UniProtKB/Swiss-Prot annotation:
High-level lineage: Bacteria, Bacillati, Bacillota, Bacilli, Lactobacillales
Keyword Hydrolase: yes
Domain of life: Bacteria
Annotated Gene Ontology cellular component terms: plasma membrane
Entry GO MF terms: undecaprenyl-diphosphatase activity
Stored NCBIfam families: PRK00281.1-2, PRK00281.1-4, PRK00281.1-5, undec_PP_bacA
Organism name: Lactiplantibacillus plantarum (strain ATCC BAA-793 / NCIMB 8826 / WCFS1) (Lactobacillus plantarum)
A GO BP annotation: response to antibiotic
Pfam families named among the record's database cross-references: BacA
Gene name as annotated: uppP
Catalytic activity, as annotated: di-trans,octa-cis-undecaprenyl diphosphate + H2O = di-trans,octa-cis-undecaprenyl phosphate + phosphate + H(+)
Note: Bacitracin is thought to be involved in the inhibition of peptidoglycan synthesis by sequestering undecaprenyl diphosphate, thereby reducing the pool of lipid carrier available.
This protein's name: Undecaprenyl-diphosphatase
Bilayer topology: Multi-pass membrane protein
Annotated family: Belongs to the UppP family.
Amino acid sequence: MLDIFKAVILGIVEGITEFLPISSTGHLVLVDEFIKMQQSTQFTDMFNVVIQLGAIMAVVVLYFHKLNPLSPRKDTTEKRNTWVLWSKVLLAVIPSVIVGLPLNDWMDEHLMNWAVVSATLIIYGVLFIVIENHNKRLTPRFANLQTLPYTTALFIGCFQLLSLIPGTSRSGATILGAILIGTSRYVATEFSFFMAIPTMFGASLLKLVKFFAHGGSLAGLQGAVLAVGVIVSFVVAYLSIRFLLDYIKKNDFKAFGWYRIVLGVLVIGYFTLIH
């Protein structure tokens, strides 16, 4: 039963951090330092990825009408625009499929550690502050998803590759990239959400396939632990997404940049002292 409680904690962490630009993987790595499951390393590695399914389902539920090209409540033009949006999203995911799949295991093996996480937390924290200060007087070139060109969508997808490095934040990399290219904060955030659907569904499916291919099982407590983590991450992510969308209507991302810097410094201090 203790692992169920830990799954709740990890689900909360995942739900809060998945779509805020502060790195869910980085936070899960850090939380794992203090809350270790009494499960195999194989299961824990799978859990830390598949728990994202709950967060992704929160996006699907929140945007179901907007993302559903078959909705009977949409006219022909709206349905066509939805198909166009999906084509841009899928185009943006292609770089992650081509480059990310071959490198993913290598990145996990060599870069999943506190030193890399703390460095990327600080680096991207600084970038958020610098870019927001630079862009505050500029008018976005793309203020809605309909005007977002295919080439821009592809460039945003290339920025997603940076999130292969632990601690970067998938949403952080894509939002920063989109803002640099000239989208509004709101468009950057929504497009990042939509890119997460195929990206993270694919990552979770791949992790599950590898888990079962290597003899893994979800029998007994393990299945319950995973289910609890996914459900909790769904509920918390739903609330986090609503918060972020309201927040960026009136604020920029600098607060998240400062948070990343402070957390990165604390991580360096903590691990330097205990090791």
